[in-house]
C-alpha cells in the first residue's frame, strides 16, 4: 500500500476521564504505533475547551518512542470543544499532506460536544472542503458506552469515512490492528448501492437503517454526490424487509452497485437480480449463516430503538438464535451479540 499520513485528534475532556476512555485511547494509539510502517507519518492533536498540537507530522522511522511519549502524556482536562479539535486536526493534516499517500484524520472521542459549534455546520464545511481539495478522509472511533454515535456518524459521512466503536483493549486491537490499517488503502471510493423492486411481484419493501445515508435515485450516477468508501476485506450490508404479492413469481429486484476507482476516479458498475425462488424459504431455515447473523443484529438494534420491523422475534428468541449461530460460526463477534 502507499504510505499513510495520519492525524490523530483526541478528546481529552472531562467526560473522557471515565473508566475505559482516555486510558483506552492511549493503549489504542500505542498499539497502532507498533503496527504502522517506517514510511508512515502521524501527528497528534488533543482538545478539551481548546485544541493543542502535541506532535506535528512525524515519520515513524526512528521516532516511535517520541510518538509513544506524546501519547502517554495526554491527561483529561475540562469541557469538550469538538469544533476546535477538528479544525486544528485538519490544519495539521493539510500542513503535513503527502502527495501519493493516504491522508486521513482519525477522531477518537465520546463525541459529546458541549462547547463550540455543537450544530456542526462549521465542522462539516471544513471536513468537506479538505476531502474535496486534498482527499483527506475521516475515521471516527467512538469511546465509552455513551458516546454520541449520531454526531460522530454525521462527521464521518461528510469526511468520506466511517465510524467504529472501542470498548475494551480487545476491541482496540481489532480496530487498530485490523480495521484501520485495512482502510488506509481504499478499494472503492464513493460507493453507492441501488435496489429497484418489481411492483408486479413486490407488495411492500423497507430498507432497514441507513436513514442518513440515503441517496436520491437521480443522484445514483452523479459522481459528484458523496458515497461511501470501502477498504480491503470490508463488507457493507443493506437489509430490506420485503413482502411479496400473493402467488408472485419472477423477478423481485435488480441491485446495482456503483463505485469510483480510488486512484483514477473511473466509475464502475455491477448489477444482479433476485427472483422469488431465492426468498421462498424461511430466513431461519436455509438462509446463509451470515445473513441470519445480520438479521439478528438488525432486529436487535431495531428493538433497542423502539422500532416496528414486521416479524421481529422476541428478545429471548433473538438471544437463542444468536447463541446457536455463535456455535456454528465460531465468530467472537457473534458470541458477544448473543450475550448483549
What do the predicted segments below correspond to?
Residues 1-191, 245-249, 340:
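Exposed acidic/Ser/Thr-rich ligand/metal-binding surfaces
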Residues 44, 204-207:
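Generic preference for hydrophobic
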Residues 46-48, 197, 259-261:
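Residue-level signal for short segments within beta-strands and strand-turn junctions
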Residues 82, 108, 139-141, 206, ...:
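Generic detector of intrinsically disordered, low-complexity, polar/charged segments
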Residues 192-195, 199-201:
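Long, C-terminal catalytic modules of enzymes
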Residues 202, 210-237, 242-340:
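Long, acidic serine/threonine- and proline-rich intrinsically disordered regions
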Amino acid at each position: 500500500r502507499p504510505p499513510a499520513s495520519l492525524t490523530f485528534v483526541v478528546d481529552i475532556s472531562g467526560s473522557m476521564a471515565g473508566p475505559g476512555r482516555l486510558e483506552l485511547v492511549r493503549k489504542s494509539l500505542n498499539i497502532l504505533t507498533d503496527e504502522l510502517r517506517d514510511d508512515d507519518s502521524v501527528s497528534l492533536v488533543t482538545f478539551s475547551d481548546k485544541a493543542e498540537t502535541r506532535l506535528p507530522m512525524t515519520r515513524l522511522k526512528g521516532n516511535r518512542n517520541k510518538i509513544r511519549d506524546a501519547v502517554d502524556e495526554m491527561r483529561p482536562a475540562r469541557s469538550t470543544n469538538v469544533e476546535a479539535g477538528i479544525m486544528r486536526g485538519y490544519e495539521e493534516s493539510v500542513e503535513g499532506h503527502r502527495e501519493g499517500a493516504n491522508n486521513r484524520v482519525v477522531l477518537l472521542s465520546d463525541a459529546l460536544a458541549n462547547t463550540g459549534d455543537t450544530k456542526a455546520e462549521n465542522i462539516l464545511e471544513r471536513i468537506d472542503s479538505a476531502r474535496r481539495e486534498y482527499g483527506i478522509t475521516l475515521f471516527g472511533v467512538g469511546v465509552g458506552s455513551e458516546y454520541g454515535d449520531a454526531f460522530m456518524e454525521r462527521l464521518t459521512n461528510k469526511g468520506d469515512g466511517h465510524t467504529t466503536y472501542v470498548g475494551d483493549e480487545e476491541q482496540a486491537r481489532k480496530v487498530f490492528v485490523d480495521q484501520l490499517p485495512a482502510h488506509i488503502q481504499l478499494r472503492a471510493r464513493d460507493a453507492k448501492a441501488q435496489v429497484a423492486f418489481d411492483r408486479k411481484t413486490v407488495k411492500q419493501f423497507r430498507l432497514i437503517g441507513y436513514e442518513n445515508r440515503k441517496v436520491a435515485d437521480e443522484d445514483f450516477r452523479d459522481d459528484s454526490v458523496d458515497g461511501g468508501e470501502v477498504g480491503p476485506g470490508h463488507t457493507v450490508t443493506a437489509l430490506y424487509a420485503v413482502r411479496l404479492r400473493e402467488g408472485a413469481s419472477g423477478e423481485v429486484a435488480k441491485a446495482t452497485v456503483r463505485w469510483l476507482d480510488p486512484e483514477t476516479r473511473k466509475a464502475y458498475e455491477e448489477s444482479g437480480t433476485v427472483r422469488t425462488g431465492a426468498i421462498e424459504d424461511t430466513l431461519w431455515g436455509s438462509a446463509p449463516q451470515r445473513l441470519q447473523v445480520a438479521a439478528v443484529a438488525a432486529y436487535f438494534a431495531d428493538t433497542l430503538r423502539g422500532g416496528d420491523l414486521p416479524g421481529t422475534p422476541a428478545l429471548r428468541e433473538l438471544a437463542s438464535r444468536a447463541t446457536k449461530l455463535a456455535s456454528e460460526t465460531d465468530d467472537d463477534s457473534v458470541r458477544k451479540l448473543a450475550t448483549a
